[in-house]
């Protein structure tokens, strides 16, 4: 019985191995669809809890930069997220995030540090890369 259990565990670990875009090995235990749904659900909850910015100009600015980044995602990764959505949250937090399922959150406080579109693009590109590299799936 113990050998069967160990064999099953070894098979599971081999089946769950994946490689990130950087070539690093990953242990992926959940399907991309499951993790994407968790990201979508979390984002919906966050939108209910956090104040969303009403500044249309800044929202368009963030959306424009995010669109430019998403447009450059290689075709081989575009299948993992079909629709990216950006929300600008009205908060002094100097932060941004991206969740599985293609949801990007940016806090207005980020503009204290990101003074131009190149700096914003660096932050958003970093966050999008987390999604493409399936980092959330590794953490589950």
Question: Model-found features: residue ranges?
Answer:
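Bacterial N-terminal signal peptides that target proteins for export
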Residues: 1-8
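Peri-catalytic and regulatory segments of divalent metal-dependent proteins
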Residues: 18-140
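Polar low-complexity intrinsically disordered regions enriched in Ser/Thr and small residues
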Residues: 10-11, 26
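C-terminal motif of bacterial Sec signal peptides marking the signal peptidase cleavage site
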Residues: 13-16
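Short, isolated positions within intrinsically disordered regulatory regions of eukaryotic proteins
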Residues: 8-9, 88
